[in-house]
Structure formats: structure tokens, C-alpha cells
């Protein structure tokens, strides 16, 4: 009596590597699972001394190979390219026991029609290479999610196989601890020997034991253990240079990848700057056009306002107003005509201002010329009013004793400051001093002669006193 049991085993390091490679990818990703399928026959005895044989198959996943470009292995119709698949897997085709598919932004771990087609093609291709049955070829679906604070990462996974009934059924997974082995599924110390392996190639430990040719019957167990330890240390020391070379190759590749990333980043930055520069030029050009259009609009508005003001002025002036009926209104104005009218108006205003200023200058000149009188007229002018008692004498000195004032005049207290102020005001407002040296005086009356001489003398003294002040 025999029944079958299928189990998938994987180490913690291999499972962590699988999750890490999927999370660090940008989008969806696929790849292959490397390992071997082990078949065990476990014999048990019942209470009635019946022997029961149980066949257990353990599919041990040891490593993974990721494929960044899924379209590299198959075309748009989901048919795989066997030549490209061989070039991608190379010498690891005998270790392929399944494939995986990682999807982002989804919580559904079910196979699509595309996944089913790819699974059948991969199983038929690799089962003929490594001797593994198509029923034991695995499919692993994975997804990942993070919490709101990005502090917790959640991973979901399921292993499936295609059974004989044509359906995909899930397979239980067991994660091996450091002290466990893939063959000891129950955690016991008893290590069964596999009856059949999917891979015929021996591992490193088997090669090491075979190279020693130990005779267990003749050599003590302690001595054989010491020989195995020394051989293992020698093998590890021989692997150090190979590991160093591989690490150097990896470092060189990482350096090249970093340089390519920097180059791509600089190209993208230059492209962005170029686009931004073009956008800035477009924006500046658009702003200039907008400013120009705004200036044109404002000038048009000003022209319309000038035209409206001119119309209002024409309406207010009776001589220029004309009766305009509702049917005679102008529908639109000519901008050029408005500009010409405003320019002509400004020119006329400037000419009128010039004429007014010229008239004012002419009036001031006439005023000064009219105000210039001869000395006899000044001397014969009466200071007091005619008919008054004090108007007997002629001259400026007579009648000083009178304190009568004409109506409208005010009494001002004379101070040195005010006299100085009046003198400065006289200098600034009065016309230039006249030279009375050549003035003709009539000799008819002695009073007039004496007054003219006094006036002439005082005027000369005044001119002499003002001469040093004019700098």
C-alpha cells in the first residue's frame, strides 16, 4: 500500500532573496526557481504488523533567477522562444524546477490564461532536460503591500502545480531552519536516503567524500572525520580566489551600472532644462505679446476717451454745437482721425500759450516804459491832495508834520528789518535805476532847480551805496 505526498521546502535565505528581488523591481517580474525534486519511501508498521510504504516527494528550492524583461522569453502571442530561453538559462537548465510571477498593485493570486499557457510550455521544455515530471513543475505567484506608514511590508505567495486532472492545485510550503534538512520534513533526527533525485549530478560534499576514498572498516571514525574536515578546509581555501574574482566582476559591473545611471540622469536633466528653456522663451514671448496687446488696448481706450472728451466739449460750446438726431449718430470712430485731432489740439494749445506768454512780456515792457517819467514831472508832482491845507509846498519834504491818512491805508511800524526787506523788495520789483545825470531841468523857478539838484544828489548817493551790494 502506497500513497503520495508532495511538499515544497525552501530555506529562509532563499525565500528572503525571492522577496527582495521582487520588491526591488520597478514593476511586474518573472523568473525561474532552481533546486531539485527528491523522492522518499517511508516504511511504517501498524499494530497488526502491517508494513505501510509512503512515497513522499520534496521539491527543494535553493536559488532563483530573475528575468527583468518578460517579453525577452516569449512573444505577443505567449509562445516561448526556446533559443532565447536556452541562452538565458545556460547551464542551469537542469536545476529549473519551476517559475514564479510577481505582480504589483493586486491582491488576487490566481492564474490568468497567459500564466497557464506559459506554465505548460515551461513544464514541457524543462521536464525533458532535468528528468523531472511535468506534474511536479511548480508555479509561484507573489505580491507585496505596505502599511499606511510604510513600516510593515506584507508578502503573499502560493505554490501551484498542474495535476493529472488538468487543474492547478496549491502545494504546502515548509521553510527549513538552519539545523533542518530538506529531507527531514518531520523534524526528526532520522535522515532518510532519497530513492531518486531529479538531478543526476552530485553535489560538492559527495564529490569530496568520493575523492577521499575512505575505508570505514579500517579507519577509525575520529580519524575519518578529521580527514573530511581537512579536505573541506582545503576545498574552501581553493574557492577563495574564485570568490574574489567573482566579487571583482560584480563590483565592476555595479560601477558600470552606476556610471550609466549618472549618464542617463544627466541626459534627462539636460533634456528637462532644454524643455524648460523653450518653455521660458515661449512664456517670455507670450508675456511680451500680452504687454504689447495691453499697451495697444490702453492706447485705444485713451484715444476713445480723448474723442469722447472732444465730443463733450463740442456739445458744451454753443457756437460749435450742432443738433444731432438719433439717426445721425456715428456708429464708429476712426482711430487715426482721433489721433490727428488730438495732435492738432495740442499744437493749437501750445501756440496759444506761446502767444499769451509773448503778450504778457509785451505788457510788462510797456508797463516799464510807461512808468519811466522825466525828473520835472516827478518834482512837480504834488505829494498831498489838492485843496488840503498842507498842499502848499512842492516837493517830497514838505508836509511831514501832517498825520492824516487817506482811507484804506494802514499804519506800518518801520523797523530796520522791514526797511531792509522793503529795500530788497524794491530792488527786486522796481525797474533798473535811471541815470539822471543827463536829465534836462527848466530854469524857470529856483525852487524847482534846487529840488532837482537835491534829487539828483540823493539819487547819485543811492546808486553809489547800491553799487557795492550788487555782486
UniProtKB/Swiss-Prot annotation:
Low complexity bias locations: 359-370
CDD domains membership: Abraxas_2_insects
Result for mutant: residue 177 to R: Strongly reduces deubiquitination by the BRISC complex
Job of this protein: Component of the BRISC complex that specifically cleaves 'Lys-63'-linked polyubiquitin, leaving the last ubiquitin chain attached to its substrates. Does not have activity by itself, but the catalytic subunit BRCC3/BRCC36 needs to be associated into a heterotetramer with FAM175B for minimal in vitro activity. May act as a central scaffold protein that assembles the various components of the BRISC complex and retains them in the cytoplasm. Plays a role in regulating the onset of apoptosis via its role in modulating 'Lys-63'-linked ubiquitination of target proteins.
Protein name listed in UniProt: BRISC complex subunit FAM175B
UniProt xrefs under InterPro entries: BRISC_FAM175B_helical, FAM175, MPN
Pfam family for this entry, one: BRISC_FAM175B_helical
UniProt GO cellular component terms: cytoplasm; nucleus; spindle pole
Coiled coil: 245-272
A GO molecular-function descriptor: microtubule binding
Lineage: Eukaryota, Metazoa, Ecdysozoa, Arthropoda, Hexapoda
Family indicated by similarity: Belongs to the FAM175 family. Abro1 subfamily.
Entry keyword Zinc: no
Domain MPN: 7-161
GO biological process: attachment of spindle microtubules to kinetochore; cell division; mitotic spindle assembly; protein K63-linked deubiquitination
